[in-house]
Amino acid sequence: KLSTKTVTGRKMMDANNNNHGNNNNNVNNNKGPEADGTNSIVSKKKKEYSAKQLEVIDATKHSWKAYKKYGFGRDEIKPISKTYHTWFNIGLTLVDSLDTLLLMGMDDEYEEAKEWVANTLNFDINQDVNLFECTIRELGGLLSAYTLTKDQLFLDKANDLGKRLLPA
């Protein structure tokens, strides 16, 4: 049977819980990063990660370093030619990576990406876009970042983009 649990202020269906809406079991009622500035999304410290988890984080850091060096703020990089590709000129890779950076505890990289979103990301352009890619990567990336952090910046950007995509 399906029932509901509250997750960050929203309800989600949970097939494993049979409390039929009696919501005494909050999964996570945090509202984003803790008041003391720590990232409550990532509760593990690096010393608690397994060797395989650390390898994945290292690989992601390696990829992010290449993205930063060869195409930061661009839609995609071309790792072989060490150049970038501008598909829609809206930082697809950067925005699509926000949740990954958060979940992996890559706080410095996340802050850098967030700063780019705040200061550079602008949808006031006359550009054809692929609706599917723009929706899943850009809109989805902004909404994921908002869901994880509750930072209004991401919701405002998502709302702006969503309104622009709506006529399509």
Each model region followed by its residue ranges:
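Glycan-recognition and catalytic cores of secretory/periplasmic carbohydrate-active enzymes
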Residues: 1-17, 22-168
